């Protein structure tokens, strides 16, 4: 039985396009956009430069294609996690679990999104720019008891940035070996930390 296709590859994609997408994501995650050339992608994929140009006008369009698909997947998984639960504590746990699970299951995707957002975000389609991770974090924080009480003790934007930033930075710390993975092992500690921040 063949391995399942990564989510960023469509089952209708021809073999060359599949390998080009796989190779591109790997290289973009490992080296970054600027340090990855068309020649690198061709070499890694086993296909020629002209094969790449049959599927994408250039490296920038290929990178943007991957960025939009990967961001949409990340956002959908985390949005579904929030929607699946009732109440702040359950939503927080589901959101953290979804994010950490994605990091463990798709580390190259999260590395690519993090490293390339500054360059690709402004060029992304309107749906991607509307469906932000910080927007999901704000939605989550809006459910927190201290935020709902409107006491002013917790700033919603600062709390959302703290949650999203901590999740992203933990992934980076695991990536560079500053802390041990898997990411899922941090779930309870992070939920406790975030509850202390806003609950």
Task: State the predicted function of each range.
Residues 19, 90, 94, 98, ...:
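Amphipathic alpha-helical interaction segments
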Residues 30-34, 85, 106, 147:
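Short coil/turn segments at alpha/beta junctions that flank glycine-rich nucleotide-binding fingerprints
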Residues 65, 79-105, 159-163:
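Hydrophobic alpha-helical connector segments
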Residues 72-75, 122-147, 157-161, 184, ...:
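Amphipathic alpha-helical packing segments from all-alpha helical-bundle domains
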Residues 100-139, 149, 176:
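Short secondary-structure transition hinges
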């Amino acid at each position: 039985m063949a391995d399942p296709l990564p989510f960023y590859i469509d089952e209708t994609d021809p073999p060359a396009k599949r390998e080009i997408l796989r190779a591109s994501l790997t290289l973009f995650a490992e080296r970054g956009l600027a340090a990855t050339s068309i020649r690198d992608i061709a070499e890694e994929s086993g296909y020629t430069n002209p094969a790449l140009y049959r599927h994408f006008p250039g490296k920038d369009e290929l990178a943007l294609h991957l960025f939009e698909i990967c961001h949409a997947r990340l956002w959908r998984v985390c949005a579904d996690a929030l929607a699946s639960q009732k109440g702040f504590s359950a939503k927080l746990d589901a959101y953290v679990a979804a994010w950490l699970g994605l990091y463990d299951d798709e580390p190259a995707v999260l590395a690519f999104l993090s490293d390339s957002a500054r360059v690709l975000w402004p060029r992304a389609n309107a749906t991607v720019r509307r469906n932000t991770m910080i927007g999901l974090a704000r939605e989550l924080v809006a459910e927190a008891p201290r935020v709902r009480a409107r006491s002013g003790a917790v700033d919603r934007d600062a709390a959302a940035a703290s949650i999203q930033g901590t999740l992203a930075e933990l992934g980076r710390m695991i990536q560079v070996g500053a802390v041990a993975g898997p990411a899922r092992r941090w779930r309870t500690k992070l939920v406790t930390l975030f509850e202390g921040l806003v609950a």
